Regions:
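Intrinsically disordered, low-complexity non-transmembrane regions of multi-pass membrane transporters
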Residues: 1, 118-137, 240-259
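Hydrophobic transmembrane alpha-helices
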Residues: 1-71
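C-terminal transmembrane helix-loop-helix hairpin of multi-pass membrane proteins
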Residues: 6-9, 171-259
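Hydrophobic, membrane-inserted alpha-helices
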Residues: 11-15, 32-38, 56-60, 78-82, ...
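Alpha-helical transmembrane segments and their membrane-interface exit regions
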Residues: 36-39, 57-64, 102-110, 215-218, ...
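Transmembrane helix interruption/hinge and helix-loop junction motifs
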Residues: 42-49, 88-93, 202-204, 217-224
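Hydrophobic, small-residue-rich transmembrane alpha-helices and their short perimembrane loops
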Residues: 54-123
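Helix-loop-helix junctions within the multi-pass membrane cores of secondary transporters/permeases
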Residues: 95-189, 193
Length: 259
C-alpha cells in the first residue's frame, strides 16, 4: 500500500494534536485505543487500526511515567506501528515489535527537547517578577508549537519516506525473524499487564484475579463477557460499601409538671 502526501500530512497533524493532548489537554486522545482507529480511518483500514491500537494499548497500559523515568513514546509508537501494520499487512503482534524501537527513540528526543526548553525558565522568572503576562503567554505558545512540530516531523518523515520501502523490507526479511518479532510483540502486552498489576495489586484483589483467569483460560469466555462480569462485581462492591443515608434524629420533647 502506498501512502499519499495528504495521508502522511494528516497523520502528522494527528501526531501534533495528540502530542499537545498528552502534556496539556489530557483528554486521553493520545492513547493507542483511540489513535489506532484514527490512523485506520486516515489510511482506509479501520479494522486493522482497531486491532493494532488495542494490542498497543495492552503494551502501554502499565507503562506510566514516574518522574524522570519515562516510558517509550506512546503516540509515535502507535502511529508508526499501526501504519506499518496497515501498509505491510503483518499481524498486530509484529507491528508491536516494530513500534517500540521508534517509541524509544522519539522519547529520547522528547527528553532532549524538554531539557532545552528548561533554559527558558529563568527568562520566565524575570517576566513573572515584572508581571509580564503576555511574555509568559508567548513562551507557552512557542513551547507548544515546538512540541507539536516535533511530533509532526517524527510521524510525517518515517511514514512518507519509509512506507514505500516497508513492504519490500518485510518481503526480504527471513520468516524466522518475522516470527520472532511476532513472539516479542505477543509478550509485550503481558509485560504491560504485569507492570500494571505490580502497581495496583493488593491482597483483596487476588480472588478477582483468579476468577478472571479461570473465566478466560478454562471457561473460554470472551473478554467482553469477563469485563461485564467484572463491572457487575465492582458495582456490587461499591454499593455495599456506600454509607446508607441516616435518618434525622427526632427532636426531643420537653415535659413540664409531669405532662
Amino acid at each position: 500500500m502506498e501512502i499519499s502526501l495528504f495521508q502522511a500530512i494528516a497523520l502528522g497533524i494527528l501526531a501534533f494534536i495528540a502530542g499537545l493532548d498528552m502534556f496539556n489537554g489530557l483528554t486521553h486522545m493520545h492513547r493507542p485505543v483511540v489513535l489506532g482507529p484514527l490512523v485506520g480511518l486516515i489510511l482506509g483500514d479501520l479494522h486493522t487500526g482497531i486491532l493494532t491500537g488495542g494490542t498497543l494499548e495492552l503494551v502501554w497500559m502499565g507503562l506510566a511515567p514516574l518522574a524522570g523515568a519515562q516510558p517509550p513514546n506512546v503516540i509515535i509508537g502507535t502511529i508508526v506501528g499501526t501504519t506499518f501494520a496497515i501498509t505491510t499487512g503483518v499481524k498486530p503482534d509484529v507491528a508491536v515489535g516494530v513500534a517500540v524501537p521508534f517509541a524509544v527513540a522519539v522519547q529520547m528526543g522528547i527528553t532532549f527537547l524538554f531539557s532545552v526548553m528548561s533554559g527558558v525558565m529563568s527568562r520566565c522568572d524575570r517576566m513573572a517578577a515584572n508581571a509580564d503576562t503576555r511574555g509568559i503567554e508567548r513562551v507557552n505558545y512557542l513551547a507548544l508549537l515546538a512540541l507539536g512540530t516535533f511530533y509532526f516531523l517524527c510521524a510525517f518523515l518515517p511514514i512518507y519516506f519509509g512506507a514505500e520501502h516497508a513492504k519490500t523490507a518485510i518481503d526480504v526479511l527471513p520468516e524466522r525473524l518475522i516470527d520472532g518479532l511476532g513472539v516479542a510483540g505477543g509478550i509485550m502486552p503481558a509485560i504491560g499487564f504485569a507492570v500494571l498489576l505490580k502497581i495496583m495489586m493488593k491482597n483483596v484483589y487476588i480472588p478477582y484475579f483468579i476468577i478472571g483467569f479461570v473465566a478466560g483460560a478454562w471457561l473460554k469466555l470472551p473478554v467482553l463477557a469477563i469485563a461485564a462480569a467484572a463491572l457487575a462485581m465492582a458495582l456490587i462492591d461499591l454499593l455495599r460499601k456506600s454509607p446508607e443515608p441516616t435518618q434525622p434524629a427526632a427532636p426531643k420533647e420537653e415535659f413540664e409538671d409531669g405532662i
